[in-house]
């Protein structure tokens, strides 16, 4: 079986680049002079990705240590001020830096933000009202600018990466995004777009069979629409679809679909083993990696050209073991 997700990047001259809040990489840039080093990022993702670190607060000239800042006022357009009530207001400086930086992230294929940060928090950031009470409805100023300027860029915050499903989904989206960027750099063509779709069919099916059919129908109009416009519409929809986690039921549907390609190639005993292990996954008795590994074993013995192209079987490096907990 081919391993497209790795071959295109891991064996090449460059690794996929991820933006990361600097404190998560161990940089002592927090207001108290400390850091929030994240083991998963550094010790696991760090072996496969190149990190580009950002600390908006240090970038605008705030020292370390420094008074902490917090968001106040309107949840939709809060101001970033000192928590000490000393009159320090860095809103404008943060917004200018964030807007300028967010427009220059073309080389990144994903971003991991520091949760709860008034500059980097992706969601549920505290915003204080006049009464001093806080609502957890805000977004950090820098994180908001990055997401607005790069709406298709896969983003997460480190706290959510503790969830195995969210973790696997994020990394999978990063690799899809990277493959798309590589396609665009090599030159968009009708063939390249159709090849991209073909290789991602089962991955899309695992997330949404309806969207999989919708995207196929969209590409069926290639001859009647501008390639650039249609490609943009296509990839926007792909990233929307992949943002929702694939359910166990839909994974089972894909596994059974793959099994169909082996029905004439394997004997009754091996077919029964495959059916049994897929059912064990359906019942939550084994993780997703188990039926996929067994299917890959049989496809190595009985290669199928269409199946060998499917990103679903190898959406990210095996060494990350992201499907071992799904």
Question: Where are the language model's segments positioned?
Answer:
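Glycine-rich anion/phosphate-binding loops
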Residues: 86-106
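Acidic, Ser/Pro/Thr-rich low-complexity regulatory regions
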Residues: 154-326
């Amino acid at each position: 079986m081919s391993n497209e997700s790795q071959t295109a990047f891991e064996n090449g001259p460059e690794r996929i680049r991820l933006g990361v809040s600097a404190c998560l990489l161990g940089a002592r840039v927090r207001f108290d002079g400390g850091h929030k080093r994240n083991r998963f990022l550094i010790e696991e993702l760090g072996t496969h990705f190149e990190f580009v670190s950002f600390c908006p607060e240090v970038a605008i000239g705030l020292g370390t240590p420094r008074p902490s800042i917090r968001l106040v006022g309107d949840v939709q357009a809060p101001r970033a001020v000192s928590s000490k009530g000393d009159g320090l207001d860095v809103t404008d400086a943060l917004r200018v830096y964030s807007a300028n930086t967010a427009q220059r992230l073309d080389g990144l294929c994903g971003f991991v933000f520091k949760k709860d940060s008034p500059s980097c928090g992706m969601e549920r950031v505290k915003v204080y009202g006049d009464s001093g009470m806080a609502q957890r409805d805000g977004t950090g100023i820098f994180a908001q600018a990055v997401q607005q300027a790069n709406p298709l860029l896969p983003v997460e915050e480190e706290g959510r990466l503790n969830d195995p499903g969210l973790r696997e989904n994020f990394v999978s989206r990063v690799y899809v995004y990277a493959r798309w960027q590589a396609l665009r750099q090599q030159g968009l063509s009708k063939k390249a777009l159709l090849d991209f779709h073909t290789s991602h069919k089962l991955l899309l099916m695992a997330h949404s069979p309806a969207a999989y059919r919708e995207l196929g129908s969209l590409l069926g109009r290639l001859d009647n629409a501008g390639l650039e416009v249609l490609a943009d519409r296509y990839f926007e929809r792909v990233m929307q679809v992949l943002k929702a986690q694939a359910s166990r039921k839909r994974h089972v549907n894909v596994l059974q679909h793959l099994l169909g390609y082996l029905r004439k190639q394997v004997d009754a005993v091996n077919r029964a083993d495959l059916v049994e292990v897929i059912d064990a996954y359906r019942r939550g008795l084994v993780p997703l990696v188990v039926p996929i590994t067994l299917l890959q074993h049989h496809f190595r013995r009985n290669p199928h050209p269409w199946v060998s192209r499917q990103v679903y079987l190898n959406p990210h490096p095996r060494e990350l073991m992201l499907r071992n907990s799904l």
